[in-house]
Regions:
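Short helix-initiation/N-cap motifs at beta->coil->alpha
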Residues: 41, 80-91, 95, 127-129
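Acidic, polar ligand-binding/catalytic clefts
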Residues: 1-48, 120, 125
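A ligand-binding cleft/hinge motif common to bilobed small-molecule-binding domains
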Residues: 12-21, 65-68, 92-94, 98-127
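Ligand-binding cleft/hinge of the Venus flytrap
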Residues: 25, 62-83, 90, 112-116
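Beta->alpha turn/N-cap motifs
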Residues: 4-16, 39, 57-61, 86, ...
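Periplasmic-binding protein-like
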Residues: 29-37, 113-152, 170-182
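Extended ligand-binding regions for polar small-molecule ligands
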Residues: 40-43, 47-61, 133-172
Length: 182
């Protein structure tokens, strides 16, 4: 994006920790990064992951959260497997190769729906953040502002909820961007 090869980065791109790196349109949607386990697992809370193995997608927020050790809710004894392809982490949990996974809640829900598997998402999220569209810091075209305005209009007139509702149940909960950090 900085080189101008692409205009923006758009696709489940969380703003958290990147606010000063890019110009942002949004947030347009709430993202919950969560941990999930097999439905029959005895793991009920993040603290129960002590001594367990968790698969995460490489370069994603869950990987950062688990590997930096900066979140006191995450036991230091968790073994983290960083996987390049996120669909592999879901299969690893379904096959019992790992004790848990950490990813976007929406991705986990969609995988469960598409593959008829039963994971249990832990109640306490790893991170609640806004998804946005990132533009280069030196981009002066104003596309970030225009897109922010357009997304706000789409949210106000129900267009975003209708679009998200085609893919996710309870679409309105993903549009509560005003509650992020509250």
């Amino acid at each position: 994006v900085e080189s101008g090869a692409i205009d923006c980065i758009w696709g489940c791109f969380s703003m958290d920790g990147r606010e000063e790196v890019y110009r942002w349109a949004g947030p347009y949607m709430v993202s919950r990064q969560v941990a999930a386990v097999d439905a029959d697992s005895s793991i009920r809370a993040l603290s129960d992951l002590a001594g367990k193995t968790v698969a995460v997608q490489s370069t994603g927020k869950p990987e950062e959260i688990f590997l930096t050790g900066s979140d006191p809710r995450i036991p230091q004894s968790v073994e983290v497997l960083s996987i390049e392809n996120r669909s592999v982490q879901y299969a690893m949990l379904a096959c019992g190769y790992v004790d848990g996974i950490a990813a976007h809640e929406t991705g986990i829900l969609q995988y469960m729906k598409d593959n008829a598997v039963d994971f249990r998402i832990l109640e306490e999220p790893l991170l609640v953040t806004g998804l946005g569209i990132a533009f280069a810091k030196n981009d002066t075209r104003g596309l970030d502002s225009q897109l922010t305005d357009t997304l706000a209009q789409m949210r106000a007139d129900g267009t975003l909820e209708r679009i998200i509702g085609r893919y996710l149940e309870n679409a309105s909960q993903y549009l509560e961007v005003d509650t992020i950090g509250a």
